[in-house]
């Protein structure tokens, strides 16, 4: 076919190569973009999975890292037993008085910042109630101001604060039966008043703090760990010296094996802030409890050994017996103390 003397088919054939070149160039660019996006997707996929792997490994490492616990009073009755029981499960900081003076706010702040514990377990205290009566200023400095210094520093540094209060806060209550944490209290002795003040002020400074109202505790000397006068040792001393032991009939209180106190402490590290009764429940008076314990001892009659005291606490019965329902629920059943008598039976079976 000819158009104006020119072969139209030849013209069309001559125009084809530029279009083909353009198509080829576009195809190459599309291919490059395709390869770029594929590489990008692969890179992002690898980066995602690699990041997840790093995160997973970090979680494993963190799970296997010992939690660092600052224990005050680590050389004392409860503190030494806590360290002995949990030293392989936690990284325990047990400073001396020279390293950490709890009555010095700057010393407390500096130690916590420098050592970065996750938990402060405050067990140091003046626990002799008679001594506190005779030395109220010293008792307040240690049992109140020391607690407040630790509570404030813990709050400022995001540290969980656990500290011991006492069943002595109930020393003044006239109600019968096991007492819960919600009952109004008005302690009659210096020690109990200072413990109550420490609870109130510490929780004001550090709302996530946990105050454990501990009972009277007992144990024997083990592996050089200190021991003080307690229910079991008082009876043992009476047996050894053939000296009658006079015990009140108008007193009700829980008495707890120190082993159980120490065993449940890690479970308190995750409790919501607040006050918790902490120790064995008991429905018997102190004289009756002692008589039942003596009956466990082979061939021992409690009659000549124990004498009831009906005169002590004449105005009203001294009731320090506590209900532990709150801590049982809050811990999901993890903190579950046996009764005083069941604890004594187990303790005696393991002597």
Place the predicted regions along the sequence by residue.
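N-terminal Rossmann NAD(P)H-binding glycine-rich loop of SDR-like oxidoreductase domains
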Residues: 68-85
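Adenosine-cofactor binding site in Rossmann-like domains, unifying the SAM/SAH pocket
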Residues: 91-108
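NAD(P)H-binding glycine-rich loop region in Rossmannoid oxidoreductase-like domains
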Residues: 105-142
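NAD(P)-cofactor binding segment of oxidoreductase domains
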Residues: 134-162
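Catalytic helix-loop patch of NAD(P)-dependent Rossmann-fold dehydrogenases
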Residues: 141, 146-149, 169-212, 217-218, ...
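NAD(P)-dependent short-chain dehydrogenase/reductase
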Residues: 203-253, 260
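Mid/C-terminal beta-alpha module of Rossmann-like enzyme folds, strongest
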Residues: 264-312, 348
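Conserved C-terminal active-site "lid" loop/helix of NAD(P)H-dependent oxidoreductases
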Residues: 285-291, 306-336, 341-346, 350-351
């Amino acid at each position: 076919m000819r158009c104006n003397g020119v072969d139209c088919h030849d013209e069309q054939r001559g125009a084809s190569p530029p279009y083909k070149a353009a198509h080829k160039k576009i195809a190459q660019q599309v291919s490059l973009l395709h390869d770029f996006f594929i590489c990008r997707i692969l890179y992002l996929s690898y980066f995602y999975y690699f990041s997840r792997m790093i995160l997973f490994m970090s979680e494993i490492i963190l799970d296997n890292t010992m939690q660092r616990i600052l224990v005050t009073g680590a050389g004392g009755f409860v503190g030494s037993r806590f360290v002995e029981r949990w030293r392989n499960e936690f990284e325990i900081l047990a400073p001396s008085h020279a390293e950490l003076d709890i009555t010095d706010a700057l010393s407390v702040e500096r130690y916590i910042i420098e050592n970065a514990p996750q938990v402060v377990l405050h067990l140091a205290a003046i626990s002799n109630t008679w001594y506190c009566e005779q030395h109220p200023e010293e008792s307040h400095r240690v049992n109140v101001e020391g607690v407040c210094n630790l509570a404030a520093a813990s709050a400022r540094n995001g540290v969980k604060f656990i500290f011991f209060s006492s069943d002595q806060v109930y020393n003044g209550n006239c109600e019968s039966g096991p007492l819960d944490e919600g009952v109004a209290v008005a302690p009659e002795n210096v020690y109990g008043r200072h413990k109550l003040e420490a609870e109130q002020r510490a929780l004001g400074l550090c709302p996530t703090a946990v105050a454990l109202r501990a009972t009277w505790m007992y144990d024997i000397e083990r592996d050089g760990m200190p021991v003080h006068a307690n229910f079991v040792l008082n009876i043992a001393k009476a047996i050894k010296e053939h000296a009658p032991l006079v015990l009140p009939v108008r007193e009700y209180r829980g008495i707890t094996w120190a082993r159980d106190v120490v065993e449940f402490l890690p479970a308190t590290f995750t409790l919501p802030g607040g006050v918790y009764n902490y120790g064995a429940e008991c429905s018997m008076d102190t004289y009756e409890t002692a008589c039942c314990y003596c009956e466990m001892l082979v061939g021992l009659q409690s009659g000549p050994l124990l004498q009831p005291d009906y005169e002590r606490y004449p105005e009203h019965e001294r009731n320090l017996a506590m209900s532990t329902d709150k801590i049982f629920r809050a811990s999901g059943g993890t903190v579950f103390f046996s009764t005083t008598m069941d604890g004594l039976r187990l303790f005696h079976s393991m002597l």
